[in-house]
């Protein structure tokens, strides 16, 4: 007796917004035919806080504590772009020592961000062992941050014209010790992960993006460099003092999840090289120049004058943003983080447009997961590396 064939019904599954592998409050509406993904629709906005509108009602210094809540795992970069925008707009020069300190902090933050990507990414694939080794090294970076800035996260360390405080005594030696130790840690990760046959089965050939597709979708960072495009803003559009260091852009041509993993692991080693060179070359001198500039404006001010000590020092240094516009960008761990700033001869920005790398990189997700298996969604989403704080803003 033959049973009549019935048409299979498609299944619609909600993944998130409270799924442990969603890396934040991301919701995916997935249409399945058995285990095969037919369609995927990301739903964003659960973490929208109006960051661009808040900026239009604050001075830059007042706004600085807010920006660490975009990408809260790489806060040095959000601070850097926030102070770079008015510095470029008003042509404010920063001391060489402050620029070197910024580079050191940015590269430490890049390593911490990549580590915090790698640990959960491996856990998503079912590999729990590397997670604990990775967080061991990340803890050392946070100890360095705490010693220099007073905070493990949300540092609020960068200032217009420099940084908030100089490096404490003995900090540079501890940082060099960490660099030597961490290079051995990267080798350990590669031995544990890179040649693991189960890991390779899960990531090799999964989530392929060609170089042309990557450019057309506006991807940046490791997503772009893993598809054969050697584009790193630290090389092609140098900022701070990156043009004074010798390092190589990490890239792969395969364009799959494995290539994105290899790019990020390679970047951690290159970041250590940059930090070591910056520490070796770091000059003496002031760590910020804004107080000196404000002091010189007052003809009759004295260093021990009442007005300078109590009225000039305590409030935020305010200055008007001239009627100009510019776009400034940095190479964040997840890609190109940019700010489009429009001044209006007032203390507040007239327009503060954020270009978050995670939001733009996430747009290609539905195309990548179609015709893949349900289990591959976590691999592909993890390889993109998103933080919903900067995606939703």
Curated annotation (Swiss-Prot):
GO terms for biological process: photosynthesis, light reaction. It catalyses: a plastoquinone + NADH + (n+1) H(+)(in) = a plastoquinol + NAD(+) + n H(+)(out); a plastoquinone + NADPH + (n+1) H(+)(in) = a plastoquinol + NADP(+) + n H(+)(out). It is a peripheral membrane protein. Its EC number is 7.1.1.-. One of its GO terms (cellular component) is chloroplast thylakoid membrane. Its main location: plastid. One of its GO terms (molecular function) is NAD binding. The keyword NAD applies. InterPro entries: NADH_Q_OxRdtase_suD, NADH_UbQ_OxRdtase_49kDa_CS, NDH1_su_D/H, NiFe-Hase_large. It is found in: Plastid, Chloroplast thylakoid membrane. Signal peptide: none annotated. It comes from the Eukaryota. Keywords: Chloroplast, Membrane, NAD, NADP, Plastid, Plastoquinone, Quinone, Thylakoid, Translocase, Transport. NDH shuttles electrons from NAD(P)H:plastoquinone, via FMN and iron-sulfur (Fe-S) centers, to quinones in the photosynthetic chain and possibly in a chloroplast respiratory chain. The immediate electron acceptor for the enzyme in this species is believed to be plastoquinone. Couples the redox reaction to proton translocation, and thus conserves the redox energy in a proton gradient. Belongs to the complex I 49 kDa subunit family. NDH is composed of at least 16 different subunits, 5 of which are encoded in the nucleus. This is NAD(P)H-quinone oxidoreductase subunit H, chloroplastic. It comes from Hordeum vulgare. The gene is ndhH.
